[in-house]
Regions:
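Short, hydrophobic/amphipathic alpha-helical patches that form generic packing surfaces
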Residues: 222-235, 274
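Short, solvent-exposed helix-loop connector elements
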Residues: 50, 96, 173, 180-188, ...
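Polybasic low-complexity intrinsically disordered regions
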Residues: 1-68
């Protein structure tokens, strides 16, 4: 009754999980012709095996957060057919190794400092390690010790990030097996832009300030904040473009003045690209 009073359409009244809502939105934007390179999400979505599998079934690349407690198998895991000592012969294969948590598997990994882009205060760097694994997100099967255990899924990248604060984050991605650690890090950290946008929508433009009780009112409020954000973003990009143009003009003028007074060639230097949301 409350949903009806709020004007919620009948097709949106059924309860849905966050991954289900996300998949519906992904299908919607794909159908509208939007192109994107990779689906990024935090562990609230990434820890869902059905969500990751649904992305793969759609032929999408993804890099998502993962709980440190998620069980994984090494990529070289083999499925064996155990011989039952008593009783009926076993019908299904089982892994020849037990799964371990993502945290435990990467604990002894080779961590290396990776720089993925330039920020306002210099290069952004962090410690990363990566290993090919198979996440324990397949169907559940009863093992020899009578314990239920998830079977290994598809082979993917398991990535660990160790921040300067000591905090560690874990991610999983279906990027190609020949992807470099820098590519993995840059792809994972690209989600920072989305997080910044969401934070600014809430803190600067009041996305979370709506106090109404109607479906239409909520959507109008969200639409207006997004229009305002799009306008501000266009102004930022124009300002960034002008600054880059001014730097190029100043560099060209400096080169011309140098060459007029000194016949020796001036060594050119690359101008870093300004990052913007």
């Amino acid at each position: 009754m409350r949903l009806k009073r709020a004007g919620v359409p009948a097709e949106h009244r059924a309860a849905r999980t966050k991954p289900e809502i996300a998949l519906a939105e992904i299908d919607r934007v794909i159908a509208s012709g939007v192109r994107f390179g990779c689906v990024l999400a935090d562990s609230g979505y990434g820890s869902s095996g059905p969500f990751r599998q649904a992305l793969s079934e759609r032929g999408l690349l993804w890099a998502v957060g993962l709980s440190q407690r998620q069980n994984v198998y090494p990529a070289d895991i083999a499925l064996i057919f155990p011989i039952a000592k008593t009783g009926k012969p076993r019908k299904y294969h089982i892994p020849d190794q037990s799964p371990v948590s993502a945290e435990a598997l990467l604990a002894e990994g080779k961590w290396q400092r990776v720089s993925w882009r330039r920020g306002t205060k210099g290069r952004l760097t962090c410690l990363f390690t990566a290993r090919r694994v198979r996440v324990a997100d397949g169907h559940k099967h009863r093992m020899l010790n009578n314990r239920m255990q998830c079977m290994p899924g598809d082979e993917v990248w398991l990535v660990g990030e160790r921040r300067s604060t000591g905090e560690q984050k874990y991610y999983v991605s279906n990027l190609p097996a020949d992807a470099t650690i820098k590519t993995l890090a840059a792809t994972i950290k690209a989600r920072w832009v989305c997080e910044q946008a969401h934070q600014q929508l809430k803190e600067e433009l009041g996305l979370d300030h709506f106090e109404g009780r109607s479906w239409t009112g909520l959507h109008r409020h969200a639409l207006m904040t997004m229009i305002a954000y799009a306008f501000l973003q266009s102004r930022r990009l124009k300002a960034a473009g002008r600054k880059k143009k001014n730097r190029r003009t100043a560099t060209t003028t400096k080169h011309a003045g140098h060459q007029a007074s000194d016949p020796r060639p001036l060594r050119t230097t690359s101008t870093p690209t300004m990052s913007s949301l």
